[in-house]
């Protein structure tokens, strides 16, 4: 079991291309496909103003970005050792180890999708997979690309299975 905690301080979630009620399932599929089952992830849905403020305060960078990733650990965490299979194990009231926190700007997501000529939902899944890869300890490169592809494909499978 995995858990996603969603915060929407800017009331921007309505602009997501994936319904808020479906985001947890998307993350669960991504985590299962990439060996990160059994962790909690925090997701903050932001606008450009909020993500720009966090970007400057936390990273010293000026301006908005698409997604920020804040791993809970200095190194990739160990998988919870008990041989759990995806979708089994702890119930919703059990404490799970925190993998990390993500901040997604809906404004930048939509702007980039338009500029890149991509479907907004596809770009959203790509950004969420990218952020998940960073909090799992991956940096840019071939391993990150493989991680992102596995996560994105799993998320797409859950979206088309409905």
From Swiss-Prot:
One of its GO terms (cellular component) is cytoplasm. Keywords: Cytoplasm, Endonuclease, Hydrolase, Metal-binding, Nuclease, Ribosome biogenesis, rRNA processing, Zinc. GO terms for molecular function: metalloendopeptidase activity; RNA endonuclease activity; zinc ion binding. Gene3D superfamilies: Metalloproteases ('zincins'), catalytic domain. Its cofactor is Zn(2+). Binds 1 zinc ion. It comes from the Bacteria. Its main location: cytoplasm. One of its GO terms (biological process) is rRNA processing. It holds the Pfam family YbeY. Zn(2+) binds at residues 130, 134, 140. InterPro entries: MetalPrtase_cat_dom_sf_prd (IPR023091), YbeY (IPR002036). Its EC number is 3.1.-.-. It is found in: Cytoplasm. Single strand-specific metallo-endoribonuclease involved in late-stage 70S ribosome quality control and in maturation of the 3' terminus of the 16S rRNA. HAMAP family: Endoribonucl_YbeY. Belongs to the endoribonuclease YbeY family. This is Endoribonuclease YbeY. The lineage of its organism: Bacteria, Pseudomonadati, Thermodesulfobacteriota, Desulfovibrionia, Desulfovibrionales.
């Amino acid at each position: 079991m995995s858990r996603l905690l969603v915060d929407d301080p800017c009331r921007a979630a309505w602009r997501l291309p994936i319904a808020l009620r479906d985001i947890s399932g998307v993350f669960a599929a991504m985590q299962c496909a990439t060996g990160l089952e059994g962790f909690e992830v925090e997701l903050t849905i932001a606008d450009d103003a909020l993500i720009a403020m966090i970007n400057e305060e936390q990273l010293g960078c000026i301006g908005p970005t698409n997604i920020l990733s804040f791993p809970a650990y200095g190194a990739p965490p160990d998988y919870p050792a008990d041989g759990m299979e995806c979708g089994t194990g702890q119930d919703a009231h059990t404490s799970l180890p925190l993998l990390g926190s993500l901040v997604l700007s809906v404004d930048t997501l939509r702007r980039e999708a338009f500029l890149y000529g991509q479907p907004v939902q596809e770009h959203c899944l790509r950004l969420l997979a990218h952020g998940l890869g960073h909090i799992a300890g991956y940096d840019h490169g071939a391993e990150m690309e493989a991680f992102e592809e596995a996560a994105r494909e799993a998320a797409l499978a859950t979206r088309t299975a409905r």
